[in-house]
Amino acid sequence: YQGEPAEALTQLVTFVIRLCGCTATLSSDEVRDLEHRDAVQERIQSHDVRAPYPIVSRTKPWSGVRKSAARLIAKLWADASEAEVLADDDLLDTWQSWLVGLSVSSIRAFRHTASVVALWTIGALSAQLEQVRESYDVAVKQRDAEARRTSSSSISNRTRLAHTAHKMEQLDT
């Protein structure tokens, strides 16, 4: 995402569309143009959507798709958090816009798949939030412990306290 954000978003939205059982393709301009998203979705939904779409299909080639897709979404958001990409509003706004748009579709494959992917996304983002909270709590405890041990004349202790405070500021952003 950091090198080619438009292409990464296009691949991500295309992945969801493929999970719906649709073979339509999107350009990066279509994915990022949120004002005309409804028209693009109508075009996508006019494509032939397979009856047993991959996320619910129990046939042999599709049997593991649901679990694999859930793991991929969780890994994607974990990696995005580590790379500090979650602060990019364009990523989350575009992702949310497509999921919301697809989740209100009249076609069950789109509606169901987008809703499930949205739930996976919420779960993955919640897990990332929990990790940040745990890191923040550890940093606060370290800062408080350092503050108790610090004497006003000790330069090395002040340096450690400043380092811990800096670490907390990083976690806050």
Segment roles from a protein language model:
Residues 133-146:
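Alpha-helical scaffold repeats of the Armadillo/HEAT/TPR superfamily
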Residues 1-135, 165-173:
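Alpha-helical solenoid scaffolds in large eukaryotic transport, assembly, and signaling factors
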Residues 152-163, 167:
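Flexible glycine-rich, low-complexity coil/linker segments exposed to the extracellular/periplasmic environment
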